[in-house]
């Protein structure tokens, strides 16, 4: 008897994996871990789970001992190598990262996240992406909750950029499909007029609010005092607009819209009446370049009353406010899929938004520095944003187009048709004119002279039809004046003479009679014809009988099997007949005008006889087009000696009809 294999022991395996993991960390080599993994008895899943626990145990000890970030990152790097070698589960590195970021303070989390950013290519690989994308998203969201939006602005931005690099553009978790707003972004300002300091003189405001040291700002560099006095009402209305920018849905309410309209007109009037000088902005820009060009960005507006004068004198601040207007107007005018049906602008609101948009662009172009260029750039970006809105309204379809599966049989690529194939020498003996209707008309009668003599080409009217109107006018009871009679029309008289010469024996006048004028002659002929022609009732009855005969003939013609056979074969008929044809396809091929090269191509494409037969019929259908009818196929079968198949196809065709 062969010895039984040793059983898997979790404590023993975990001890061995822990020891080999520490050895691999010390040697900075994964070989000891691979060797232990191959020596430990048990299934692969059991060993992977045990090694995952060993990694988490070692990481826990390092965190408790307050080890450096380098030691922690070494463990995670070793786990990544283990996943690549197939000895760890794919989620192990992400679980370790989550444990580390949950336990370390924010300053050390910055170092750990730098490691995460550098390995974004690893996380996007096929081995890690599907297993770790949810871990990374949850880890980043937990980290964002711990960070302060005002104090850790840069760190928050790095996390958002990392997520943008990690996930594809069509990832649903980052698209805000329902167009929700960040209602938590509340702008706090002084709402108590009693506590306002704007009523004091400008000098007192400057002394209490800002102590300017000597040499900090000269008299020439100081902003000029606003020509429109800034009071508490302007301050309150200005900062109240931020609530509409935060939640644009308020603009669809009647009362809120009136408030927004009133506040906006006053604020924009201030911007129009107090325009900035380009020299001050240029001087400020030059000073920034001399000092290194460092630009400090604040995520929130400073709403102190003492800064109102300086803010209105700042070109960047004005650009922020005007840009908020343009973004708000674009949302109000745009088509948003999840916008309520009640959120519709009136014609008056739409007109005001259109006029105000032009005013805002004008203010942007007048705002230094490079106002004209900045205005055009903003307009271009907002126009491009319309494409993004349309894409979201369509449900964010993927930009990667998948190749459609082709289930149809491969069609044989044929060379250009030889002249004899369309000059009446094919199996159908038809001359192809290059157009379906022209081909049908040309082949109705092969002999052109016989076609010209056909009774169907007789377009000359009968005497009854042509002279019917003249006979009615000649009747005295109708009391038609001579000048209105048709016989007095020269054109009518010319055609009447030609018809009488062909159809009537009274055309030739006896030589002993005096020649009359054309109207008198026609009047005399009309009287003679009226006596010879049958009464109208008999004529109508005869016409009805002829119509009935024509209808019966038409019905019989429609019921003719020849007409039904003129229809081209369908794909279903080809599929059924190919199964019956089978191995005899090669006998039929020459009679379908197939060349030897095409027959060899069919033999090379498939080993299955039924598939070869199907390819033969498909190639014949492509070659003949609308002339690939069951009747032509039956003729080819009879010529090739396959009478049984021809009879079977005839019966199937009659049954389907």
UniProtKB/Swiss-Prot annotation:
Instruction: Mark the transmembrane ranges.
Output: none
**SUPFAM superfamilies linked:** DEATH domain
A molecular function annotated in GO for this UniProt entry is: RNA binding
Where in the sequence is Phosphothreonine found?
A: 4, 542
Which keywords belong to this entry?
Answer: Acetylation, Apoptosis, Cytoplasm, Deafness, Disease variant, DNA-binding, Isopeptide bond, mRNA processing, mRNA splicing, mRNA transport, Non-syndromic deafness, Nucleus, Phosphoprotein, RNA-binding, Transcription, Transcription regulation, Transport, Ubl conjugation
One GO biological process this protein is involved in is: RNA splicing
The UniProt entry's GO CC annotations, sorted and at most eight, read: cytoplasm; nuclear matrix; nuclear speck; nucleoplasm; nucleus; THO complex; THO complex part of transcription export complex; transcription export complex
Induction remarks: Up-regulated during cell proliferation.
InterPro entries per the record? DEATH-like_dom_sf, Death_dom, THO_THOC1
Where are residues bearing Phosphoserine located in the sequence? Answer: 2, 537, 560
Q: Where is this region: Dock domain?
A: 133-167, 227-397
User: Where's the Glycyl lysine isopeptide (Lys-Gly) (interchain with G-Cter in SUMO1) crosslink?
Assistant: 595
Reported modifications of this chain: Expression is altered specifically during apoptosis and is accompanied by the appearance of novel forms with smaller apparent molecular mass. Polyubiquitinated, leading to proteasomal degradation; probably involves NEDD4.
Disease in which the protein is involved? Deafness, autosomal dominant, 86: A form of non-syndromic, sensorineural hearing loss. Sensorineural hearing loss results from damage to the neural receptors of the inner ear, the nerve pathways to the brain, or the area of the brain that receives sound information. DFNA86 is characterized by progressive, bilateral hearing loss that is most predominant in the high frequencies, begins mildly during the fourth decade and gradually progresses to severe-to-profound deafness in the seventh and eighth decades.
Role this protein plays = Component of the THO subcomplex of the TREX complex which is thought to couple mRNA transcription, processing and nuclear export, and which specifically associates with spliced mRNA and not with unspliced pre-mRNA. Required for efficient export of polyadenylated RNA. The THOC1-THOC2-THOC3 core complex alone is sufficient to bind export factor NXF1-NXT1 and promote ATPase activity of DDX39B/UAP56.
- In Swiss-Prot or TrEMBL terms, this protein is called THO complex subunit 1
What organism does this protein naturally occur in?
Homo sapiens
Kindly list the organism's lineage.
Eukaryota, Metazoa, Chordata, Craniata, Vertebrata
């Amino acid at each position: 008897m062969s010895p039984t294999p040793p059983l898997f022991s979790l404590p023993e395996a975990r001890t061995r994996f822990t020891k080999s993991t520490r050895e691999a960390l010390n040697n900075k080599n994964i070989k000891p871990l691979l060797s232990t993994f191959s020596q430990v008895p048990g299934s692969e899943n059991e060993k992977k789970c045990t090694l995952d626990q060993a990694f988490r145990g070692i990481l826990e000890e390092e965190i408790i001992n307050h080890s450096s970030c380098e030691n922690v990152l070494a463990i995670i790097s070793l786990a990544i190598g283990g996943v690549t070698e197939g000895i760890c589960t794919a989620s192990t590195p992400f679980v370790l990262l989550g444990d580390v970021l949950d336990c370390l303070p924010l300053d050390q989390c910055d170092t750990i996240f730098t490691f995460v950013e550098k390995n974004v290519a690893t996380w996007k690989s096929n081995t890690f992406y599907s297993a770790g994308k949810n871990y990374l998203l949850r880890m980043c969201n937990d980290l964002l909750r711990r960070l302060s939006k005002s104090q850790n602005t840069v760190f928050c931005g790095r996390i958002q950029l990392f997520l943008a690099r990690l996930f594809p553009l069509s990832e649903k978790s980052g698209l805000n499909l329902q167009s929700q707003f960040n209602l938590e972004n509340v702008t706090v300002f002084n709402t108590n007029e009693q506590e306002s300091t704007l009523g004091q003189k400008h000098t007192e405001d400057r002394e209490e609010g800002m102590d300017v040291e000597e040499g900090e700002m000269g008299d020439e560099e100081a902003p000029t005092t606003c020509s429109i006095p800034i009071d508490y009402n302007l301050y309150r209305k200005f900062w109240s607009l931020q609530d509409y920018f935060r939640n644009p849905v308020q603009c669809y309410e009647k009362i809120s819209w009136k408030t927004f309209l009133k506040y906006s007109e006053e604020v924009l009037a201030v911007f129009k009446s107090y325009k900035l000088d380009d020299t001050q902005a240029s001087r400020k820009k030059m000073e920034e370049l001399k000092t290194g060009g460092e630009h400090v960005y604040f995520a929130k507006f400073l709403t102190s009353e003492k800064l109102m004068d300086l803010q209105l004198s700042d070109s960047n601040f004005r650009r922020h406010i005007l840009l908020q207007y343009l973004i708000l107007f674009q949302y109000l005018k745009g088509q948003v899929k999840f916008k309520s049906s009640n959120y519709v602008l009136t014609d008056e609101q739409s007109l005001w938004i259109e006029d105000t948009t032009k005013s805002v662009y004008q203010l942007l172009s007048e705002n230094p520095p490079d106002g004209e260029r900045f205005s055009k750039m903003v307009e271009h970006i907002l126009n491009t944003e319309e494409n993004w809105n349309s894409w979201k309204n369509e449900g964010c379809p993927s930009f990667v187009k998948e190749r459609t599966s082709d289930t149809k049989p491969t069609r044989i690529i044929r060379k250009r048709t030889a002249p004899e194939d369309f000059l009446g020498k094919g199996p159908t003996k038809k001359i192809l004119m290059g157009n379906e209707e022209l081909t049908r008309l040309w082949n109705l009668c092969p002999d052109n002279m016989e076609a010209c003599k056909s009774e169907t080409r007789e377009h000359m009217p009968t005497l009854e039809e042509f002279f019917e109107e003249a006979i009615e006018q000649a009747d005295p009871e109708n009391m038609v004046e001579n000048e209105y009679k048709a016989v007095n029309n020269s054109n009518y008289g010319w055609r009447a003479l030609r018809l009488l010469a062909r159809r009537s024996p009274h055309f030739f006048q006896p030589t002993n009679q005096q020649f009359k004028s054309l109207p008198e002659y026609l009047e005399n002929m009309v009287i003679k014809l009226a006596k010879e022609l049958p009464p109208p009732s008999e004529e109508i009855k005869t016409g009805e009988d002829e119509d009935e005969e024509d209808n019966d003939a038409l019905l019989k013609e429609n019921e003719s099997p020849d007409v039904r056979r003129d229809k081209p074969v369908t794909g279903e008929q080809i599929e059924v007949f190919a199964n019956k044809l089978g191995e005899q396809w090669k006998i039929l091929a020459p009679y379908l005008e197939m060349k030897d090269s095409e027959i060899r191509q069919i033999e090379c494409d498939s080993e299955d006889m039924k598939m070869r037969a199907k390819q033969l019929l498909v190639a014949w259908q492509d070659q003949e087009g609308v002339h690939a009818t069951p009747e032509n196929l039956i003729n080819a079968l009879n010529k090739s000696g396959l009478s049984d198949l021809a009879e079977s196809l005839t019966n199937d065709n009659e049954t389907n009809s």
